[in-house]
Amino acid sequence: MTPPGRLYLLRVRSAPVLLLLGLLLGLPPGAQGFPGVGISPSAARTAYQHPQKHFIQGTLKPAAHLIGDPSIQNSLRWRANTDRAFLRHGFSLSNNSLLVPTSGLYFVYSQVVFSGEGCFPKATPTPLYLAHEVQLFSSQYPFHVPLLSAQKSVCPGPQGPWVRSVYQGAVFLLTQGDQLSTHTDGISHLLLSPSSVFFGAFAL
């Protein structure tokens, strides 16, 4: 049995047609057209003639992608609606936290990149610890609960410039009103650019 949410690529007269499993499952079981699939001839024609429209209509789910604000020092502040960052279909950003619009399964992800000129003092460098965490605050819990967490350390090590990246992502069952936020140690070493530091989630 194919897992829910998988994207199908069908070929009709050698033209690729994208159909979402969610659209197929939403049709009546007895619909005529493709046996065992449950899609009517009219729906199939729509998908064939207007695949982009058909695909977009089937993916109007909550999604958010945030990037770090490089204008703010000593703090990681998230921003949307700029440089490929966005909030769609119910997601909102409040007090540097993403507010979950509806209950369901979400893929939550984040990446940060740290960099430095070298280890100091050079004679006996002190270890530098870096960490990034995605946290959940919910009405079910009176405190922030870690969802994703990663740590790295640099120094002692090579005396030249260094770079460390951390990417995390996983699927979680979230509830409407949940708040997603991040906590970072080593903020002064963040390499703030839209492609290096980001945070987001989307419904499955």
From Swiss-Prot:
Annotated GO MF terms: cytokine activity; tumor necrosis factor receptor binding
Domain THD: start-end pairs: 62-204
Disulfide bonds: C119-C155
Major place of residence: secreted
One GO location term (cellular component): membrane
Keyword Endoplasmic reticulum attributed: no
Protein's recorded name: Lymphotoxin-alpha
